């Protein structure tokens, strides 16, 4: 079942299964807890899963729709700046003293406690796509950028499988650096 799922989704498997011949002749053990990463309730049936060396995938170039829409939004921003209309006027929108005092009065202990107790969500294919290409839209509003990126993601020419592979590799490695830095170091960029 597992191999069917992998072969349907990808063209090549990303791991290899090897049987342990010593345990094949014996009956399956009831509990075998010396398997790495296995709890005492799970059992090993003489299979070793070895990860193969990940392939170097090319980061696909940005979708033309994505580049066109980002250029259009930037043109809107520059035209509104030239006409004298400020997009965000912080001084009139917020009372800065209240804003700053609220953020400085929050307890540091509460902030640290909330960050340590929450689990980090695993990266999925769209999150990987969005994280990488969001750097092209620096300076745009997040809601505008999200709409543009979702349009590019749903375009038929977008290869979603490659972003799924990047996300799986990032989740498996769980590096301390961000996704963009990890991908730049482990994948080759498109021509």
UniProtKB/Swiss-Prot annotation:
InterPro entries documented for this protein: ALPHA1_Saccharomycetales, HMG_box_dom_sf, MATalpha_HMGbox
Keyword terms of this UniProt record: Activator, DNA-binding, Nucleus, Transcription, Transcription regulation
DNA-binding region as annotated in the record: 118-174
GO terms of biological process kind: positive regulation of mating-type specific transcription, DNA-templated
GO molecular function: DNA binding, bending; sequence-specific DNA binding
Compartments, as annotated in UniProt: Nucleus
Main location: nucleus
Cellular component, GO annotation: nucleus
Taxonomy, superkingdom: Eukaryota
Additional remark text: There are three genetic loci for mating type genes in C.glabrata. MTL1 seems to be the expression locus that determines the mating type of the cell, whereas MTL2 (containing MTL2A1) and MTL3 (containing MTL3ALPHA1 and MTL3ALPHA2) appear to represent silenced repositories of mating type information.
Function description: Mating type proteins are sequence specific DNA-binding proteins that act as master switches in yeast differentiation by controlling gene expression in a cell type-specific fashion. Transcriptional activator that induces the transcription of alpha-specific genes.
Assigned protein family: Belongs to the MATALPHA1 family.
Annotated protein name in UniProt: Mating-type-like protein ALPHA1
Originating species: Candida glabrata (strain ATCC 2001 / BCRC 20586 / JCM 3761 / NBRC 0622 / NRRL Y-65 / CBS 138)
